[in-house]
C-alpha cells in the first residue's frame, strides 16, 4: 500500500494561526488547540476594548475639563459649562475642550468667563 500525503489546506490554516499567535507566551504560541482558543479570546477582547476605549477617552476628557474649570471658580463646574455651551449653541466638543484645557488654560478660562458673563447678563435682564 502506497502512502498518501495529506493536503496543504489544513497546514496553511494552522500556520496562519501560528503567525497570529507568534507573540504569545508559552503553550499559547505552540499548541494548536490553545492557539485557537487564545485567538478567539484575543479577537473578542479587541472588539470589546474598541468600544471601551471610546468610553475611557470621553471620561478622561471630562475629568480634564472639570479639573481646570473647578480651579477657576468654586461654584462653576463641568456640567454647568457644558449646559451653558449648549444654550449658547457653541460647537465645541469635549475632545477640543480638553485639548484647550491642557495646552492653554487661559483660553478655556476666557471661554468660560464669556459664557458666565452672558448667562449672568441674561438672568439680570430677565431673558432666558
UniProtKB/Swiss-Prot annotation:
Alphabetized UniProt keyword annotations: Plastid, Ribonucleoprotein, Ribosomal protein, RNA-binding, rRNA-binding
InterPro entries: Ribosomal_bL20 (IPR005813), RIBOSOMAL_L20_CS (IPR049946), Ribosomal_protein_bL20_C (IPR035566)
MF terms in GO: rRNA binding; structural constituent of ribosome
UniProt keyword Plastid, yes or no: yes
Bilayer-crossing regions: none
Keyword Ribosomal protein among UniProt keywords: yes
GO biological process terms on file: translation
Compartment(s): Plastid
GO cellular component: plastid; ribonucleoprotein complex; ribosome
Top-rank lineage group of the source organism: Eukaryota
NCBIfam families according to UniProt: rplT_bact
Cited function: Binds directly to 23S ribosomal RNA and is necessary for the in vitro assembly process of the 50S ribosomal subunit. It is not involved in the protein synthesizing functions of that subunit.
Family: Belongs to the bacterial ribosomal protein bL20 family.
Name of protein: Large ribosomal subunit protein bL20c
Species annotation: Lathraea clandestina (Purple toothwort)
Organism lineage: Eukaryota, Viridiplantae, Streptophyta, Embryophyta, Tracheophyta
